[in-house]
Amino acid sequence: AHLGISKKMLSLHEHNERERIQQILNYLSEGLQIALVSDAGTPLISDPGFPLVRAVVEAGYRVTPVPGVSSVITALSAAGLPTDKFIFHGFLPHKNSERLTRLEALKNADGTHVLLESTHRIERLLQQIEQLMPEADVVLAKELTKRHETFLRGTAEQCLQLFDQDALLKKGE
């Protein structure tokens, strides 16, 4: 109220999540725009809402994060992957043997893994993930908060196929 927002607001918590998700999907199918706002920081980072974002993504709707102080949290909040336990690994080593060793260690580690990679090495990273973890859920977040913001979701193989089909994906951050 003190912000002057007069839109309809709904609560979302573990006791009403299933019903709210369906209600929100119905609103989206009617063409309405929805905002997920939290009174506890960035939504989905140790906060309710992951099942909602996953359902919205799986239904084919676009999720656009509002940027915070970190690209990692911005990407994670809209990825549609579990956020109750995640590990940020930063950039992997450039050297192939060290890189494969690090990726092999991630194979059996629990939680969502967040990696940074340069545009010039992203294809190689996806190929290595495809080789070591062909069934892993992958989200490639690029150009966050920019005009060409993109989230590719699927296996590494599926992301590679999408990446190969669009020259714009090979540019930017």
Locate the predicted segments by residue.
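Short, well-ordered secondary-structure micro-motifs
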Residues: 22, 47, 75-77, 99-101, ...
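General beta-strand structural signal in soluble alpha/beta enzymes
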Residues: 38, 65-68, 115, 140
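Short, hinge-like loop/turn segments at secondary-structure boundaries
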Residues: 4-7, 26-28, 53-54, 79-84, ...
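A contiguous loop/helix-start segment that scaffolds small-molecule binding in enzyme catalytic cores
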Residues: 32-33, 112, 116-173
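Class I SAM-dependent methyltransferase SAM-binding "motif I" and its flanking Rossmann-like core
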Residues: 51-109
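Short, acidic/turn-prone active-site loops that include or flank metal/cofactor-
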Residues: 11-18, 69, 90-95, 143-146
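Class I S-adenosyl-L-methionine
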Residues: 1-66, 74
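Short hydrophobic/aromatic-enriched beta-strand-loop microsegments
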Residues: 6-13, 63-64, 84-90, 135-141
